[in-house]
């Protein structure tokens, strides 16, 4: 599994604040991130070769009780072997998960873009791990561990 988290980084923004927006949602070592590009085309990109950074994000979805909304946005972003979704950068700075429908327009300073290459994980297994369906607010069919990662895909 490979996880890429990317956020635009404008000249008027503080590097530390943009990094905080990412680290508030994803458990990640700072060394995994780099500034890419120049001027208005600059962005911060964090690349991880396992699912560990997603564990904090997964916890936040449960704490905020937004599993159904999260599942809907993540399902919408499912493509051939990968998932792509957008998060509001300002909400992330405050430690809150807020999904955006589009990459631009909903988050004034740009969205945080998350791309997950599923590797050997099936979309259903991944969805049921990250954001299972709920009934009366309780997760149903939840996968507690991604078994597909035990097969050596990280």
From Swiss-Prot:
SUPFAM superfamilies: RL5-like (SSF55282). It holds the Pfam family RNA_binding. It comes from Thermofilum pendens (strain DSM 2475 / Hrk 5). Gene3D superfamilies: 3.30.1440.10. This is UPF0201 protein Tpen_0695. Belongs to the UPF0201 family.
């Amino acid at each position: 599994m490979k996880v890429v988290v990317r956020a635009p980084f404008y000249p008027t923004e503080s590097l530390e604040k943009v990094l905080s927006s990412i680290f508030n949602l994803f458990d990640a070592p700072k060394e995994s991130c780099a500034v890419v590009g120049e001027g208005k085309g600059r962005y911060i990109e964090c690349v991880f070769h396992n699912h560990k950074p997603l564990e904090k994000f997964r916890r936040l979805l449960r704490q905020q009780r937004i599993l159904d909304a999260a599942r809907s946005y993540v399902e919408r972003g499912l493509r051939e072997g990968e998932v792509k979704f957008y998060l509001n950068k300002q909400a992330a700075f405050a430690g809150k998960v807020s999904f955006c429908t589009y990459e631009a327009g909903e988050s004034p300073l740009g969205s945080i873009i998350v791309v997950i290459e599923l590797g050997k994980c099936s979309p259903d297994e991944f969805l049921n791990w990250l954001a299972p369906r709920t009934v009366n607010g309780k997760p149903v069919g939840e996968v507690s561990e991604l078994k597909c990662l035990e097969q050596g895909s990280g």
